[in-house]
Amino acid sequence: MFTSSSPEQRKPRQSRQLPGAACEECRRKKLRCDRQQPQCGGSSLERRLEQQMQTALLPGDDILNMLDEPAFTVFPSSEDQLGLPAFNITNSTRGEQCQDEQFLDHFADMKGSEFTGTLTTTSIPELMRADLTLRADYRRGNGRDQLYFDRVHIFTPIIHQRRYLSWSKDAHKNEARVCLQYAMWALAASFSAPFQHLRDALYRDARRMLDLLELSDGAMATHHLEQAQAWILVAIYEFMRMNYQVGWMSAGRSFRLVQLMRLYGIDGANSPTQELPQTSSMEWIETEEKRRTFWMAYSLDRFISMRDGWPLTLNEQVVTTCLPAPEAAFQSGKPASGGFLSETITQEDTGALFSFTECIIIATVCGRSLSHGQKLEVERVYGDVSPDFWQRHQWLDAIVKKRIEILSLRCASATEVVDPLLLFTYMMAQTTVLYLCKLVKSVTWETDKSNPIVQEYEQRSLAAAQEIVNLTHTLKQFNFLKVHPFMPLPLYLCAEFLSMYRSLDASFDAQLQEVQNALRNLQAVNNLARTYLNLLQVKEREGSLRSSSEEIDL
């Protein structure tokens, strides 16, 4: 049985082999040529795309100027925008057919091709639409690549710019690198006002390609670093623009890839880097990218587990990978060592560390604090609190104090706007004080409410909460598109603490309002802020209902 079709669909399909010789441009690009004179449809199509991109997109200087506008200039995407309608390419039915065939042939003929044996013919045109637009855009000068390194790299410094640019234009790059490119472009677009209308389409293509890559033949035989990097970037995008659960699952995929590639043991005694010394700058850069990818996944694992106290995936106890080298050394390709985490975290005088390294140290403290609290819960199940609790607690407390002193000096001494990664790290350090205070109160509540340790922690928690509130004013210096993507996390944890312990200080109500206002300001560009605001409202209602119930019982 055949379904009815339009007159155009009932026409017999033309032979794929057309008479005449293909034009030089199509032969060079390995595309199917329609042999039209004086110019084939493929070449004219690309020229029209470039012209429309030049009209639709602003020059580089204008884009950079627009990026500094306030966040409220961001326009939300709509369903009709997700199909990229800004690039309205009109053509005859014959021209569209030629266009589709050219790119179908292009994907089918590529050696080491993008998605060889994995893409179906129905999914190729969807990817082709975005690919057409982006190819024309990037031919204008790496605008979105540069946007990634200007806006996103400061939060996720895992990609070497020169190395990336060396393979980014290669038509025969492997599938993992194509996935990474689309993930980079999607995240970069989400941090840019002019490119907001592109972000969802880029994300959908990146996510679809990553899913297909995992299902391809030989997917389990080899894993590329770029695949893990792409999942990290996609997870960050999903936390910001989708929802927490979707981002959580994607983050888990990146953690498993990091484990499969053994990135936690890059500098161990029996690792390849120790057995085969690196002789070239590029070899060191590739290894440093692996280190940074591991530490990014490691930090992400700890930060996203803080909200609900979830168990960690990446075990600190088996890590033998050095900390990241300084950024200048990384980008210049000059080998340098970042040292091991256990040594750096206990050193008395470390000087001014790389911002990413400071973030990793605080992520480690967050992870150890989580494990500290989880051990406490287990100890309660089996009996009394172990004496080891206080030893662990004092050790963590000493590290937090030290890092807060260092970070406060660095933030206070900044002559210009504070580094957003450093600001986020400092706020997470203050949040850890609040978390440790909650643990102390939960333990001493069962013994002595007037314990001096409790009183000391109450005072320190008051100071930490006040400092976080003060830092929310610093956020006003930033375009909201330049704020760290996980900034809503310390704001939420602080607001939760202020709401839970309002009785500690009369100023907590006013401070709570300031923190909630900061979350409201961020929710336009970050769904995490909206999620946390909703959670606070739910907890507020539950607290009100509980208070009403207690009054009735009395």
Swiss-Prot record:
Extract the CDD domains matched here.
fungal_TF_MHR, GAL4
Q: Which domain of life is it from?
A: Eukaryota
Q: Which UniProt keywords apply?
A: DNA-binding, Metal-binding, Nucleus, Pigment, Transcription, Transcription regulation, Zinc
The cellular component terms of Gene Ontology attached to this UniProt record, alphabetical and capped at eight, are: nucleus
Using the UniProt annotation, give all residue ranges assigned to the region (Disordered).
Answer: 1-21
Consequence of gene loss (knockout): Impairs the production of azaphilone pigments (MonAzPs). Almost completely abolishes the expression of the azaphilone pigments (MonAzPs) gene cluster gens pigA, pigH, pigM, pigN, pigO and pigP. Decreases the expression of pigD, pigE, pigF and pigG. Does not affect the expression of pigC, pigJ, pigK and pigL.
Molecular functions (GO terms): DNA binding; DNA-binding transcription factor activity, RNA polymerase II-specific; pigment binding; zinc ion binding
DNA bind region: 23-40
UniProt-recorded name of the protein = Pigment biosynthesis transcriptional activator pigB
Q: Which species does the entry assign this protein to?
A: Monascus ruber
